[in-house]
Amino acid sequence: MIIPFKNNTPDVSEAAFVAESAQIIGSVKMHEGSCVLFNSTVRGDNGLIEIGKYSNIQDGCTLHTSSAKEFSTMTIGDYVTVGHNAVLHGCTIGDGCLIGMGSIIMDGSVIGEHSIVGAGALVTSGKTYPPYSLIMGSPAKVVKTITPERADTLLGYAEGYYQKALEYKKVLG
C-alpha cells in the first residue's frame, strides 16, 4: 500500500514491487528492481528513505528514521538483502550487504559495502563498520573480514529476490 504523508508521496519505480500487505509511507524512493515484501513497513514520515536498485526488504521488516535531523534519512544501497523482521532506523547500508533476520540497526550507524550483519545482531547508534565486515552479536562487533568471493554470493541473494519479485508481480499485479 502506497500512502502519501505531509505532501510526500512515495516514489516507487514501475520496475519495483510492493506487496499488498506492505506499507510505503511518505518520503520514500524505491529504485528499479527493488522490492518490499509482505507485512513490512517503510515509514518516511521524518525524512527520505531510499532503497537502491535490486535491493529487497523481506517480510516483517520495519524501516524508519528519527525526528532528530541528523538521523532523519536512511540510505540502503544497491543489491542489499534485508532479512525477515529486521529493524533499520536512520542508518546507512552500503551496496551488496546482507542484513540478517531479526537484526536491529540504530540511528547514525553505517554498514560498509559488501558486509554481513548476522541474524539477531544489535548495531548500536553511531557505529561505523568497514566494507567486507562480518558483524555479529549484541552489541555488534566485527568478527572477521569476508572475502570478495563470499561477498559475490551476497549479490546472488539480491538477484534471487528480484526474480521472485517478478514472479509475484505477474501473479499479484
Describe the function of each predicted region:
Residues 151-173:
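Acidic/histidine-enriched, glycine/proline-rich intrinsically disordered or flexible terminal extensions
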